[in-house]
Amino acid sequence: MKRSLWIAKVIAMIIIPSIWLMCINAWAQEIRYITPEALKELVEKDDDTILIVDTQPKAAYKMGHIKRAINFPWTPEIKNPADLPRDRILVLYCDCTNEEDSIDMAKQLLRNLEYVYVRVLKGGWSQWQKLGYPTEKNSD
């Protein structure tokens, strides 16, 4: 009986901290959003602590994108994020109904590639355009 109790205590000492750590990791990797209004302010200030990332295909990016955005198209598995610095806040956006591509890319960056500063633009490209915020086009 004492041995069974001792084994149960040891198992509890191992399992409880593991569950606690899993919960903390899940919370830490929660997707965070930025509003179009907040991003517009940062764009207007030429804030270089952010990097705006258009996750749409290159053709869509060329047709129009948020001012100062770079193009890093969504892919099911990010292989080489060398163009995405770790020391800046990455603001991801797409033209999906519920920001699916941006959310997926954010999850990949946070969970698989251990990025820390990642945000998703609430409402995405369509909301940005609807509000009439600054855009630009590339012809290359």
Where are these regions (language model features)?
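Rhodanese-like catalytic fold shared by cysteine-dependent sulfurtransferases
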Residues: K2-I34, I50, K62-I89, N98-D140
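A short acidic-Thr-Gly-centered motif at the start of a beta-strand
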Residues: E37-D47
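Structural scaffold elements adjacent to functional motifs in cytosolic proteins
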Residues: I52-D54
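Solvent-exposed coil/turn segments that connect beta secondary-structure elements
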Residues: P57-K58, D95-T97
